[in-house]
Amino acid sequence: MKVAFSKEFEKAVRKLSGKILQSLINVLDEVKAANCVEELTDCKKIETLENVYRLRIGDKRAFFVLHIEIEGDLVKFEYLFNRGEAYDKKNMERLRRRDI
């Protein structure tokens, strides 16, 4: 699958280091190699949203919007949150706005 990143996601990634950064790199490689979302490890669809999924990466949660395209799917990573703040109202509203 093709991969794209929002500015917010890139900013959060720049703050990472060590083991969690390496885990994120491994997950991104897995996403690029996958043919469909079902092949991804620790990936779940957000039930209240149509095209938003989350990937668990240690104590972080990476949220992405899946855009179905004729030639390959585009996975756009929108946000990277700590587990504790991932599902609060403010962040869920931000995801709802990105759900196209």
Model features per residue range: what roles?
Residues 1-27:
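Arg/Lys-rich, positively charged N-terminal/basic patches that mediate binding to nucleic acids
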Residues 57-61, 65-100:
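Enriched for short, Lys/Arg-rich terminal
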Residues 24, 29, 74-77:
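Short amphipathic alpha-helical segments
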Residues 30-54:
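A short, surface-exposed loop/turn module that caps and links secondary-structure elements
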Residues 3, 21-22, 40, 74, ...:
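Non-catalytic, surface-exposed connector residues within folded enzymatic/regulatory domains
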